[in-house]
Amino acid sequence: DLWQWGQMILKETGKLPFSYYTAYGCYCGWGGRGGKPKADTDRCCFVHDC
């Protein structure tokens, strides 16, 4: 779930997941902006969204 994802990101990267990934790439965050995923993390968001 979203809470577990956030905890994993914080533990592994030390970054606050919601402020860092809310607008990351083309697909992370609320809705997708379309286009080709920019990186592996963005690709993961793409797979989750689609």
From Swiss-Prot:
Q: Mind listing the GO biological process terms from this record?
A: arachidonate secretion; negative regulation of T cell proliferation; phospholipid catabolic process; venom-mediated perturbation of transmission of nerve impulse in another organism
Pfam families, sorted: Phospholip_A2_1
Among its keywords, does the record have Secreted? yes
The free-text tissue note of the record is: Expressed by the venom gland.
MF terms from GO for this chain are: calcium ion binding; calcium-dependent phospholipase A2 activity; phospholipase A2 activity; phospholipid binding; toxin activity
Q: What keywords sit in the KW lines? A: Calcium, Disulfide bond, Hydrolase, Lipid degradation, Lipid metabolism, Metal-binding, Neurotoxin, Presynaptic neurotoxin, Secreted, Toxin
> Mainly localized where?
secreted
Name the residues annotated as catalytic in the UniProt entry: H48
Q: Does the keyword Ubl conjugation apply?
A: no
Q: Further notes on this entry?
A: Negative results: does not show myotoxicity.
Record family assignment: Belongs to the phospholipase A2 family. Group II subfamily. D49 sub-subfamily.
What's the name of the protein?
A: Basic phospholipase A2 Bmaj-9
**Organism of origin:** Bothrops marajoensis
